[in-house]
């Protein structure tokens, strides 16, 4: 369950949004500049709202009145951005293991081999990011986020940088992850059809 009320002011930009849902995969839809990424950054702990609260799975991550503000590390969210943001000097396997190595063994929900097979990355594990297509990079970024065993997966326009062919290639992998892995997800996009295809419910900004 996600329950958040985020209020903040950044220069001329003002945000005051309240969302609550028990659905597993939530879509956040709105035009560019409507505050979608700001909401994700607030939930992740990258930005601190001026007031409000953020509760995920009955745990309070932020509450202005109660003076609660967990760090990004304490929240343990998985982030996937539109440009993948892989480490260019690390191969695919090293990228996949980055978050995995930074959590305790008892916190790990998935084996590396399971995620590699789920996302069909076996033939790519020794490649450097520069040798990957856009769709392959996003699969690696998704795998890296999942291996961090997040309490919440935040996907910020993960397909917007891909052409139609690469979108068609990667959407089945997202659908497979949604079907097989029951991690709450917040999926941001300005593409309404994409959100309708991949999420359980849509929030409008």
Question: Which residues are covered by each model-predicted region?
Answer:
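ABC ATPase NBD coupling module
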Residues: 61-78, 102
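A short, proline-enriched helix->beta-strand linker immediately N-terminal to the Walker B motif
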Residues: 147-151
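Hydrophobic anchor residue at the start of the ABC signature
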Residues: 142
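Conserved H-loop
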Residues: 182-188
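Conserved ABC ATPase signature
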Residues: 128-132, 136
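Catalytic Walker B motif of ABC-type/P-loop ATPase nucleotide-binding domains
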Residues: 153-157
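Conserved ABC ATPase "signature" region
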Residues: 64, 107-124, 175-176
């Amino acid at each position: 369950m996600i329950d958040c009320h985020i209020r903040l002011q950044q220069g001329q930009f003002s945000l005051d949004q309240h969302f609550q849902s028990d659905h597993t995969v939530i879509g956040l839809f709105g035009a560019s500049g409507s505050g979608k990424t700001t909401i994700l950054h607030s939930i992740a702990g990258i930005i601190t709202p001026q007031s409000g609260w953020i509760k995920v799975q009955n745990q309070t991550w932020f509450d202005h009145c109660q003076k609660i503000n967990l760090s990004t590390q304490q929240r343990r969210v998985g982030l996937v951005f539109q440009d993948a943001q892989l480490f260019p000097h690390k191969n695919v396997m090293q990228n996949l293991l980055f978050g995995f190595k930074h959590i305790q063994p008892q916190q790990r929900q998935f084996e590396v081999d399971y995620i590699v097979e789920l996302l069909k990355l076996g033939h790519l594990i020794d490649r450097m990011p520069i040798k990957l297509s856009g769709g392959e990079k996003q699969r690696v970024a998704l795998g890296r986020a999942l291996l961090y065993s997040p309490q919440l997966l935040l996907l910020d326009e993960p397909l917007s940088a891909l052409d139609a062919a690469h979108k068609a290639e990667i959407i089945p992998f997202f659908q497979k992850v949604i079907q097989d892995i029951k991690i709450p997800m917040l999926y941001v996009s300005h593409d309404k059809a994409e959100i309708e295809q991949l999420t359980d419910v849509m929030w409008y900004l």
